[in-house]
């Protein structure tokens, strides 16, 4: 029976082959060669189109396609470019006039110490930032001059040093190691749950810390799981540094919506996880609204899928540990949370170190080693570097160490008490203005607010005219202030000016001369995000 079935099947296959060959004999060999190749090519195109639609959404793809067709019409592209230039000119707000006397060649004869006088004159053109800027400068009060003086002395002592030369400048190498260790101790390195291997390096800022964490996670996941088409998932409140990292390292980035409380949506994050996912992200707190994401839940999610989980503590690293000690109800956020593999912390924000100092921390050395770049085949010798920069300013490392050692735990506790109390007072004051609403429930020192009754960007323009420098946000349209020690004595002034700004917009709605409300409003509503992207690039290009 088996032999009969086999012979019958063989006979049927021979007959089918003969019939197929007979039919195909009607076509030229070249056609038979091209058809499968063209089919494969079309399949790849269709697959790519579906991938783009899946990533960007059907609406965004259609808008982009239509705008591309419109730009092909004679005159349309020129019109768009002209309108774009008008917006760029308005955004510059007179900064072009400051470029008229720009020095472009070396002076024939050096200025000597006179250069300091020239620098003092230039400094007078800076905006008045004392107490008026959101974030930006984090030290304040009567003690600020003393702190600045101490930092400047520390930086001056080590202005010639470079941690790249480990054998020469052992002092700043030690300083860096101790800054990392002290920062890690604030974030759970001494707790059993951390695993006892927390390590890291200093970087130039929060962006480099995040970029390095992404790079290390990508390479670690390639080593552990063989992932070659990496993807990462971040909440839409996640910092734009992740977009940079995604562009630099060819990682597909998924931005998922936040929940109704403006925290990372764990369920939405889970839905986007697949076999190519290398990492997920949380913030403590997020830059836009000062709200801490559900770090514990995200940590469990990362653990269950065996992927990396980075926590952005650039703002909260030198506040949340002390706020918790002061009795504030702070949800878990550090290495005590299982699943957290890396953390970024800025020392130059609430750590009160000189600008250009941050840290990136890892749960263990196995992950961190993927941050390093080692070169063995260079004619210049064997080379290894821990961060993106080769040479690094040892002066900033020394300044950060001096800031942390001079303030100590007591100093940071006192500072945290002041700014947390100021933040709560400011938040309560904003809530009392009926035309405004506070976004979510801020966990730290950022208060974001919008309005259903007014154009919030017009309110921002009025505040700008009063000397305040606040941050404009989108989705929803809003503005925020990041409270620092600079703001502790001026909370009442801020609330008074804010009430007046609201009343002014109520009485006279509409943009003010030179205001940016129309631009912010239009950018938020513009469906073609590619055009907004071009606008931002044109503006940045005009600044340098």
Swiss-Prot record:
- Annotated metabolic or biological route of this protein: Lipid metabolism; sphingolipid metabolism
Q: Where expressed (tissues)?
A: Expressed in the peripheral parts of leaves and the bases of trichomes.
Transmembrane stretches in the record are 30-50
Keyword set for this entry? Endoplasmic reticulum, Lipid metabolism, Lyase, Membrane, Pyridoxal phosphate, Signal-anchor, Sphingolipid metabolism, Stress response, Transmembrane, Transmembrane helix
What EC designation does it have? 4.1.2.27
Where, in residue ranges, is this chain on the Lumenal side? 1-29
Write out the GO MF terms: pyridoxal phosphate binding; sphinganine-1-phosphate aldolase activity
Entry similarity comment: Belongs to the group II decarboxylase family. Sphingosine-1-phosphate lyase subfamily.
Q: What is this protein called?
A: Sphingosine-1-phosphate lyase
Q: Which species expresses this protein natively? A: Arabidopsis thaliana
| Origin organism lineage | Eukaryota, Viridiplantae, Streptophyta, Embryophyta, Tracheophyta
């Amino acid at each position: 029976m088996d032999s009969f079935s086999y012979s019958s099947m063989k006979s049927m296959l021979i007959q089918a082959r003969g019939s197929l060959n007979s039919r195909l004999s009607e076509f030229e060999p070249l056609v038979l060669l091209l058809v499968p190749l063209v089919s494969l090519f079309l399949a790849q195109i269709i697959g790519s189109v579906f991938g783009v639609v899946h990533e960007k959404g059907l609406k965004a793809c259609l808008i982009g396609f239509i705008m591309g067709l419109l730009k092909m019409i004679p005159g349309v592209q020129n019109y768009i470019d002209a309108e774009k230039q008008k917006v760029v000119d308005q955004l510059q707000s007179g900064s072009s006039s400051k470029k008229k006397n720009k020095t472009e060649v070396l002076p024939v004869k050096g200025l000597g110490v006179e250069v300091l006088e020239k620098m003092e004159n230039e400094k007078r053109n800076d905006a008045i930032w004392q107490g008026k800027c959101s974030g930006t400068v984090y030290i304040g009060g009567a003690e600020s001059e003393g702190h600045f003086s101490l930092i400047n002395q520390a930086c001056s002592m080590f202005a010639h040093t470079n941690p790249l030369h480990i054998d020469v400048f052992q002092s700043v190498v030690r300083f860096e190691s101790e800054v990392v260790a002290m920062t890690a101790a604030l974030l759970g390195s001494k707790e059993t749950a951390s695993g006892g291997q927390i390590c890291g390096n200093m970087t130039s800022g929060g962006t480099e810390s995040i970029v390095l964490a992404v790079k290390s996670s990508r390479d670690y996941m390639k080593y552990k799981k063989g992932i070659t088409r990496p993807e990462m998932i971040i909440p839409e409140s996640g910092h734009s540094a992740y977009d940079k990292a995604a562009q630099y390292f060819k990682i597909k980035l998924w931005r998922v919506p936040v929940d109704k409380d403006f925290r990372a949506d764990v369920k939405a994050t889970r839905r986007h996880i697949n076999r190519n996912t290398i990492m997920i992200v949380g913030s403590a707190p997020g830059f836009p609204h000062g709200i801490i994401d559900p770090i514990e839940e995200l940590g469990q999610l990362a653990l269950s899928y065996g992927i990396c989980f980075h926590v952005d503590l650039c703002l909260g690293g030198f506040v949340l540990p002390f706020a918790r000690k002061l009795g504030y109800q702070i949800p878990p956020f550090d290495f005590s949370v299982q699943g957290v593999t890396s953390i970024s912390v800025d020392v130059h924000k609430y750590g009160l170190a000189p600008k250009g100092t941050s840290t990136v921390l890892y749960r263990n050395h196995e992950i961190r080693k993927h941050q390093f770049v080692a070169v063995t085949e260079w004619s210049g010798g064997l080379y290894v570097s821990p961060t993106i920069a080769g040479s690094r300013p040892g002066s900033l490392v020394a300044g950060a160490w001096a800031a942390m050692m001079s303030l100590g735990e007591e100093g940071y506790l006192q500072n945290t008490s002041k700014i947390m109390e100021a933040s709560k007072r400011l938040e309560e004051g904003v809530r009392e203005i009926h035309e405004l609403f506070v976004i979510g429930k801020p966990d730290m020192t950022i208060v974001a607010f919008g309005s259903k009754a007014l154009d919030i960007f017009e309110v921002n323009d009025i505040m700008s005219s009063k000397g305040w420098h606040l941050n404009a946000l989108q989705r929803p349209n809003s503005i925020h202030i990041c409270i620092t020690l600079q703001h502790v004595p001026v909370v009442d002034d801020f609330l008074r000016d804010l009430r007046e700004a609201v009343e002014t917009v109520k009485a006279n709605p509409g943009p003010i001369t030179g205001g940016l409300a129309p631009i912010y409003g239009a950018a938020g509503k513009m469906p073609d995000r590619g055009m907004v992207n071009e606008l931002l690039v044109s503006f940045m290009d005009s600044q340098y």
